[in-house]
UniProtKB/Swiss-Prot annotation:
This is WD repeat-containing protein 25. It comes from Mus musculus (Mouse). The gene is Wdr25. Residues 141-155 have a biased composition (Polar residues). PANTHER family: TRANSDUCIN/WD40 REPEAT-LIKE SUPERFAMILY PROTEIN (PTHR44566), WD REPEAT-CONTAINING PROTEIN 25 (PTHR44566:SF1). The lineage of its organism: Eukaryota, Metazoa, Chordata, Craniata, Vertebrata. It comes from the Eukaryota.
Length: 535
């Protein structure tokens, strides 16, 4: 194997050198396969280029017609009297420059430069200061690093041309195997911090999205049926249980998603489709996550029995509580935003006050699990959907509660043998919807005695035991629901006829939600872990 370092023997200039040989074109080739002019060579600290070497042709004055190699002038040696023992020693300092690559070297990534057009606050308010000489003069280490990086990139390109794959360390290969989707773009997102650790601060832009701004001061128009996919958001490594737009209209470009991969994420689902932040505050699956009414905090609960109120920008926990059951549903009180209801794998629903961090009231029934909660009458009443579906379960499938006294208002609402995994309130009519495992949406009155409509039934989708969600459009004209086969179905509220069917996902579509401001934007999530924004 030829040596990668070219030694110049001062005793004999005519003997063959295995690491460097002269060709007829006047160039010297080293063992690495790179060529340079004959007037260039390594020195102890510098590199010299001769004028003759730069203009060398086929008939060189340093070569005789007998093809015998004549002694070359040692123009590249800084110490002409050095002996071989001195040349074998380590050089006193690194060379300042090396052979230039085929293209100009890129600027060093370690050198921080301000973006174009960026003016610091001090420069905008005070007189311009004369920059220091140390700032203007590049350091010797930085120039050495840039030249070395450029030479390394040239060597990598040469090896690529020779079909030699560069070596990848084992640590990087293991990281690539663990993160196959880390290919960049909006589909692959960087992993979040470990569980219990606050993520990096999230800077929420104070300006309103240019797509939302024209609709803020106007009345909501008629909802139109979406036609195509605007963004396909990938980043979760588990099923996405629910999604929700930010309730503050000027910040409604943000979308919240809760997943079984122990995280919940905030996306910019209107402008760019990128993940803004990942929150890993739970040690088990996150079953429910809700925006606070102010749009600055997120309430989350999961299978680790934990409840967290996380600040959106700092990532810290404003409130933390420990439930005695696995949490499946959370709802803020519509009037008192410091109080929320929590239900899950328990026969009791609990009301928490975040100011004291304690449970203030309990609502107990003969059930095993609460599937969903829906507030009525501006928070004075609420409905709970349970998992009771036996023959004598007419008093336990959907229960109406008085929020203040914890008394049951009605327990004879739904009389069929199907559970209802989700509930949705109509924005303008005094009615609510119940998603049933009978593969249809049932319509009920939202005032006592909560009668079910026998004339209108929205069917055509499949539930099959999934927690398939449903929702009404902001104008109330359309209903949307997911399906266990991945479809997204929209119905006319008045006629109960199907308005549109979208082939949304390859696995079960769990969550569907209309944008509160944009009339034709719809978000859907699936058991496969992906989210789609339709327009």
């Amino acid at each position: 194997m030829a040596s990668l370092v070219a030694y110049d023997d001062s005793d004999s200039e005519t003997e063959a050198d295995p690491a460097r040989s002269g060709d007829a074109a006047g160039q010297i080739s080293d063992a690495s396969g790179m060529s340079r002019p004959s007037g260039m060579g390594f020195a102890s600290s510098t590199v010299g280029v001769t004028k003759e070497g730069a203009q060398h042709t086929g008939n060189s004055p340093n070569e005789d017609p007998g093809m015998q190699r004549l002694p070359l002038a040692r123009l590249w040696r800084s110490d002409p009297g050095s002996c071989p023992s001195q040349r074998l020693q380590w050089p006193s300092k690194e060379p300042d420059t090396t052979f230039p690559p085929s293209e100009p070297p890129r600027p060093s990534l370690w050198m921080s430069r301000a973006p174009v057009g960026h003016v610091p606050l001090a420069a905008a308010c005070l007189k311009p200061l004369k920059p220091a000489w140390d700032v203007l003069k590049p350091s010797h280490d930085q120039s050495t690093f840039e030249s070395t990086a450029g030479n390394a990139s040239s060597s990598q390109r040469k090896r690529g041309e020779d079909c030699v794959l560069p070596y990848i360390p084992k640590r990087l290969r293991q990281l690539q195997a663990l993160n196959p989707e880390a290919g960049g773009g909006k589909d692959g997102e960087p992993p979040g911090p470990p569980a219990g650790c606050a993520p990096a601060p999230l800077c929420v832009a104070p300006t309103v999205s240019e797509f939302i701004q024209p609709y803020l001061n106007s009345q909501y128009r008629e909802t139109t049926v979406p036609k195509k996919v605007l963004f396909h958001l990938r980043g979760h490594r588990g099923p996405v249980n629910s999604i929700q737009w930010c309730p503050v209209f000027c910040k409604s470009h943000m979308l919240l998603s809760a997943s079984m991969d122990k995280t919940f994420k905030v996306w910019n689902a209107v402008d760019s489709g990128h993940c803004l932040q990942t929150y890993s505050v739970h040690s088990e699956a996150v079953r429910a996550a809700r925006w606070s009414p102010c749009g600055r905090r997120i309430l989350s609960g999961g299978f680790d029995f934990a409840l967290h109120l996380t600040d959106l920008e700092t990532g810290t926990q404003v409130f933390s509580g420990q439930s005695d059951f696995r949490v499946t549903t959370l709802k803020f009180h519509p009037k008192d935003h410091n109080v929320f209801l929590c239900g899950g794998f328990s026969s009791e629903i609990k009301a928490w006050d975040m100011r004291t961090g304690k449970v203030v009231k309990g609502y107990k029934a003969t059930i095993q699990q609460t599937l969903d909660i829906l507030f009525l009458q501006e928070g004075s009443e609420f409905l709970s959907s349970t998992d009771a579906s036996t023959r004598d379960s007419a008093d336990r499938t959907i229960i109406a509660w008085d929020f203040r006294t914890a008394a049951k208002i009605s327990n004879q609402i739904f009389h069929e043998r199907y559970t209802c995994p989700s509930l949705a309130l109509h924005p303008r009519e005094p009615v609510f919807l119940a998603q049933t495992n009978g593969n249809y949406l049932a319509l009920f009155s939202s005032v006592w005695p909560y009668r079910m409509s026998r004339r209108r039934r929205y069917e055509g989708h499949k539930v099959e035991g999934y927690a398939v969600g449903c929702e009404c459009s902001p104008c109330g004209d359309l209903l949307v629901t997911g399906s266990a086969d991945g479809r997204v179905l929209m119905f006319s509220f008045r006629t109960a006829s199907r308005a549109c069917t979208l082939q949304g996902h390859t696995q079960a579509c769990l969550g569907t939600t209309y944008h509160p401001v944009l009339p034709s934007v719809l978000g859907t999530c699936s058991w496969g872990g992906d989210i789609k924004i339709w327009h």
